[in-house]
């Protein structure tokens, strides 16, 4: 459906035009201050790369909905596509192939704990990436997605925060209840026939009922999810905490302000995660300590990874073999000190300034902003990285997000557009922020009234002169390349998949 709309709006020239185009509301560009938010949400100021899983793929396998789905991929292929490449693959087969090739993330990663895998590689004196490739090739190690009903591949703990998973966002709720939680359900659909089963996933005759060991939910309401949870943490609601929100329906940053303290045992979102990180760090002294992890990081869009398959031709793995970062996910060793999780939660890490930040392929240099945060938020000593800016309150975390995002800091936006202008040779992009370079939106401003965002390379709309936001106007009017291989709008009709 979306492709049909996008084809029509693109062919008619209405993309990037106020009143035209097709910018889906839900999830389109709701998270305005993305550059700073990504540093905070995924802890990339302290460690990279993060693990970020696709929700639909995770639950499709975890809730065993693939056992009931007989849809063939060819049914959804374009009439102009090379259907022979897709062949008789089921929907599940295409998902597994995409995960194994690194086109999509796949967590859990393998059928052995990554901490164990790195230790095995160390014991053999082999780089962990090389060891994993050898183990996969020899059949001693497998992708977890190939056997999601094997107990070694179950996700064991699920934390629900700001979501009524079972009552709202879960599609196929009865399968969540039956297979993920192992509780009463009204699922009545029959499993698919043997000849309809996916070829890429191991079929176990007895489907598991109850994969999770623990479901933890934090909420201020009693919902379908809290009723099915093992532990419920009472949460503060809107007028009991300091927080910030934005939406794709209008270009403003909003604050939540605490009128009262959270009653009884309720805690704010910030306090919940702060206290969990403190307890984890305390227990880690005796249990986990320092470990080396290995992250199977998917190939990134808006990056050179997109050039791994020239002309859209999918290589034959039997011919090329498994090559991390080329024909499979990147395999990145990451040192973890689990005793320092709390310390890192309370401070801004060094990587934002050292390695820079980036959104949608646009790099930002935020060294100056990190130094400014030392004065704005104060700083204190850490064992991990010396003196670091404080993030010990919710409002300090908000100020960090705003300081490091182009939509709220004109200097960051200008830096991003300067990087884009240098890469494209298009100096016209610099005009977009010549009147807002001095803008600095902070917590003190938005707690008084909503603040309107400014034009930033984080997104594709032009806000110059108070214009209403419309997606892709930046690309159409200022010739910023679209985020595609060609830099133009195109229709994905000439590749194998």
What does each model-found stretch correspond to?
Residues 1-217, 222-497:
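Domain-level signature for respiratory redox metalloenzymes
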């Amino acid at each position: 459906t979306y492709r049909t709309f996008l084809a029509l709006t693109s062919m008619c020239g209405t993309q990037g035009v106020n009143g035209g185009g097709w910018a889906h509301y839900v999830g389109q560009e709701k998270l305005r201050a993305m550059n700073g938010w990504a540093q905070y949400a995924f802890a990339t100021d302290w460690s990279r790369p993060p693990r970020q899983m696709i929700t639909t793929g995770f639950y499709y396998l975890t809730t065993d909905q693939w056992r009931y789905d007989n849809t063939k991929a060819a049914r959804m292929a374009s009439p102009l596509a090379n259907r022979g490449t897709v062949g008789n693959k089921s929907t599940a087969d295409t998902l597994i192939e995409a995960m194994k090739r690194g086109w999509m993330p796949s967590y859990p990663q393998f059928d052995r704990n990554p901490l164990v895998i790195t230790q095995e590689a160390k014991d053999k004196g082999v780089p962990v990436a090389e060891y994993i490739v050898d183990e996969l090739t020899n059949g001693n190690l497998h992708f977890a997605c190939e056997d999601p009903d094997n107990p070694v591949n179950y996700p064991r703990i699920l934390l629900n925060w700001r979501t009524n998973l079972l009552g709202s966002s879960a599609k196929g709720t009865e399968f969540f209840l039956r297979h993920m939680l192992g509780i009463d359900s009204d699922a009545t659909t029959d499993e698919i026939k043997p000849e309809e089963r996916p070829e890429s996933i191991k079929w176990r005759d007895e489907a598991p009922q109850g994969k999770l060991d623990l479901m933890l939910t934090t909420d201020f309401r009693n919902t379908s999810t809290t009723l099915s949870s093992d532990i419920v943490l009472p949460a503060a609601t809107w007028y009991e905490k300091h927080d910030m929100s934005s939406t794709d329906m209008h270009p403003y940053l909003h604050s939540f302000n605490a009128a009262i303290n959270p009653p009884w045992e309720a805690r704010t979102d910030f306090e919940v995660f702060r206290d969990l990180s403190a307890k984890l760090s305390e227990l880690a002294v005796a249990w986990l300590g320092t470990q080396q992890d290995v992250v199977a990081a998917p190939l990134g869009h808006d990056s050179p990874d997109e050039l791994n398959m020239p002309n859209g031709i999918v290589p034959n793995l039997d011919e090329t073999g498994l090559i991390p970062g080329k024909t499979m996910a990147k395999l990145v060793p990451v040192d973890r000190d689990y005793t320092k999780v709390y310390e890192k939660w309370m401070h801004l890490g060094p990587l934002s300034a050292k390695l820079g930040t980036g959104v949608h392929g646009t790099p930002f240099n935020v060294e100056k902003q990190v130094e400014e945060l030392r004065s704005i938020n104060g700083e204190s000593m850490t064992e991990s990285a010396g003196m670091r800016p404080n993030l010990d309150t919710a409002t300090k975390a908000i100020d960090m997000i705003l300081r490091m995002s182009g939509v709220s800091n004109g200097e960051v936006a200008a830096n991003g557009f300067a990087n884009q202008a240098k890469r494209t040779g298009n100096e016209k992009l610099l005009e977009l922020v010549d009147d807002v370079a001095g803008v600095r939106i902070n917590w003190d401003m938005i707690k008084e009234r909503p603040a309107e965002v400014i034009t930033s390379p984080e997104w594709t709309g032009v806000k110059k002169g108070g214009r209403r936001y419309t997606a892709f106007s930046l690309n159409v009017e200022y010739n910023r390349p679209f985020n595609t291989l060609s830099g133009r709008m195109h229709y994905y009709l000439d590749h194998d998949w």
